[in-house]
């Protein structure tokens, strides 16, 4: 089960929270979902250079608040807040509502799954060898404190005639363990041979109900050598 489903959706309400936070009704739910989708597409396109990891949308009464979690928040805000005002005006024109925007910084960009997936996709678009791109991202994540990482790419790799899937994994990535804090990211690389999908799973430790991360002593002692596999199925 844990190997097949989205690890974020599987852990909602356990150690992950929803990115759209509002109370739906039969009348407003469809329009709200459509608005959320438009907001995310707009911000991803306009703020791609800032390394956007997550977009959280909150609604209360007639207020709409958007929190953008990014690796380079200074590029979003701009000099004296000029750039962020342009983004607000663009959102207001798009959805015909007043929007307040909060900016948060990603503490460890190298250990963020979404940014790692986009990094691999960007390198593939620049014609970097896919194995080199994958290993580079994995090494950076492990140096930033990740307990384990798995990267998978699918498509016409290196211009091959037949599409295939290849993946690497280092450390532990326990997808079945619900208390495990698994970060997940997905991106697509638009290459001359077609679209290549990139998926990244990063294990950041186990979380108790109070939010305390821990690592079992027995597991630390019996830690196995990092596993690597170039080809395989999830």
From Swiss-Prot:
Keyword Iron: no
Domain KH type-2: 39-107
Cysteines engaged in disulfide bonds, as pairs: none
PROSITE patterns reported for this sequence: KH_TYPE_2, RIBOSOMAL_S3
Keyword Ribonucleoprotein included in the entry's annotation: yes
Spans traversing the lipid bilayer: none
Keywords assigned: Ribonucleoprotein, Ribosomal protein, RNA-binding, rRNA-binding
SMART domains per record: KH
GO biological process: translation
MF annotations from Gene Ontology: mRNA binding; rRNA binding; structural constituent of ribosome
Highest taxon in the source lineage: Bacteria
GO cellular component terms attached to this protein's record: cytosolic small ribosomal subunit
Pfam families referenced in this protein's UniProt entry, alphabetically: KH_2, Ribosomal_S3_C
Function: Binds the lower part of the 30S subunit head. Binds mRNA in the 70S ribosome, positioning it for translation.
Family according to the record: Belongs to the universal ribosomal protein uS3 family.
Subunit-structure text: Part of the 30S ribosomal subunit. Forms a tight complex with proteins S10 and S14.
Protein name stated in the entry: Small ribosomal subunit protein uS3
The species this protein was found in: Helicobacter pylori (strain G27)
